[in-house]
Structures are given as structure tokens and as C-alpha cells.
Amino acid sequence: MKFAVLVFPGSNCDRDMYNAAIKSGAQADYVDYRETSLDGYDGVLIPGGFSFGDYLRSGAMASVAPIINEVKRLANDGKPVLGVCNGFQILTEIGLLPGALLHNDSHLFISRNENLKIANNQTPFTNLYGENEIVVYPVAHGEGHYYCTDDIYNELVENNQIILTYEDNPNGSHENIAGIVNKAGNVCGMMPHPERALEKILGTDSGVKLFEAMVNSWREQNV
């Protein structure tokens, strides 16, 4: 399996994403936002950071980058797409995931480890975790409040699209939502950082299973 790790001006988690892909047994390349083809890639990783300085709003300017049409194409083809933090914001901006990310209720930047519950372990991103397993991922964001209308929330619940919830909501996210998938289950966005949770020496290795799950799920379908 070969991942494209997207790089925008202001990305700062691209190396972490690359490392996570390699550690999970996949191949990976950094792909500049000005590229117009993702031919040859089996999945996309959209990292955190502050793409284009978060001007206008988080993810807004990245949403019109040349590479985005290819991200949409791969997503529509059923290939896995993971967006973390700013990557999640970008996925909502381009319409691959519902809802929006607002400023934290505290209006402060939050950076700490958070306990999270695996709310759905039947996706290509979470199928190596136990049902309702508690994991620890770092968060680092100022605009991590997940917002959606009641109709969208009811749809997320009905379709089992909520995959990750906060045990102690740090930002005011609707119903403690930390991560979701699209209806097809191949596009995932989350504010916490699994790519920063790969080594026990750093405090948690809870993120390892997420990337291994992506690779294993792809191999089951393609090898």
C-alpha cells in the first residue's frame, strides 16, 4: 500500500503522518499541494498544522488547492482518506465529511493528551480496536469544536458514522464527537492526533492500531 501525504504551506504534522505510514508497513510519499495527480496512490493522509496560515478560516484556502480534486476522486473511488486536525477541517470544507469545526469554547489553544472512546470499531480505521476501547491521543488545536445540525447528528448516529468520542470534552464538540467517517466508511476525519501516539516513550502508542488497521483493510481487499 502506498500513501500520499499531502503538504500545504503551514503543514506541521506531515512528517508524523509519513512516519506513521512507514511504521504500519506501508509506503509513502510527500505530495505537494500544487500537484494535480494522485495516480499510483492507494490512500491519502491529510496532516495537521495551519494550512495557508488558517487565513479566512481553518482549511478554507487549502480546500481550493490543485490537489483537492484528486483527493475527491480517490475518495469517490473508495480509497481510504484520513484527515487529522487541520486535515479534518479540510475534509469538511471540501464536503467529503459533514459539519464544521469552530473555535474551542474556551477560545484557547488546547494541547494535551485526551482519553477517547472507540465508538465504532467496524471501520477500516478502527477495526483493530475493541468495542468501546479507551485510547489516548494528543490534541493540539484552537478550532476543534465539531459542530453539526441536529439533522446531521441524527444521520451520523443512524449510519454509525461517529467513530471516536471524547471522554472529557475539551472543546465543546457536539455530543463529544472527536472523529467521524463518511457514509461509505472510507473517509475519516478526527481532531486528535493518532500519528503522535506511536511510541510509549512519548506517553502513548494508542495510534499504532489505527494505521495498521488502514493497511490491513487495504491488503484484505487488494492482495
From Swiss-Prot:
Its EC number is 6.3.5.3, 3.5.1.2. It catalyses: N(2)-formyl-N(1)-(5-phospho-beta-D-ribosyl)glycinamide + L-glutamine + ATP + H2O = 2-formamido-N(1)-(5-O-phospho-beta-D-ribosyl)acetamidine + L-glutamate + ADP + phosphate + H(+); L-glutamine + H2O = L-glutamate + NH4(+). Part of the phosphoribosylformylglycinamidine synthase complex involved in the purines biosynthetic pathway. Catalyzes the ATP-dependent conversion of formylglycinamide ribonucleotide (FGAR) and glutamine to yield formylglycinamidine ribonucleotide (FGAM) and glutamate. The FGAM synthase complex is composed of three subunits. PurQ produces an ammonia molecule by converting glutamine to glutamate. PurL transfers the ammonia molecule to FGAR to form FGAM in an ATP-dependent manner. PANTHER family: PHOSPHORIBOSYLFORMYLGLYCINAMIDINE SYNTHASE SUBUNIT PURQ (PTHR47552:SF1). PROSITE patterns: GATASE_TYPE_1 (PS51273). Part of the FGAM synthase complex composed of 1 PurL, 1 PurQ and 2 PurS subunits. This is Phosphoribosylformylglycinamidine synthase subunit PurQ. Keywords: ATP-binding, Cytoplasm, Glutamine amidotransferase, Hydrolase, Ligase, Nucleotide-binding, Purine biosynthesis. One of its GO terms (molecular function) is glutaminase activity. The lineage of its organism: Bacteria, Bacillati, Bacillota, Bacilli, Bacillales. InterPro entries: Class_I_gatase-like (IPR029062), PRibForGlyAmidine_synth_PurQ (IPR010075). It comes from Staphylococcus haemolyticus (strain JCSC1435). Gene3D superfamilies: 3.40.50.880. GO terms for biological process: 'de novo' IMP biosynthetic process. The gene is purQ. Pathway: Purine metabolism; IMP biosynthesis via de novo pathway; 5-amino-1-(5-phospho-D-ribosyl)imidazole from N(2)-formyl-N(1)-(5-phospho-D-ribosyl)glycinamide: step 1/2. GO terms for cellular component: cytoplasm. Its main location: cytoplasm. It is found in: Cytoplasm. The keyword ATP-binding applies. The active site is at residues 85, 193, 195. Pfam families: GATase_5. Residues 3-223 form the Glutamine amidotransferase type-1 domain. It comes from the Bacteria.
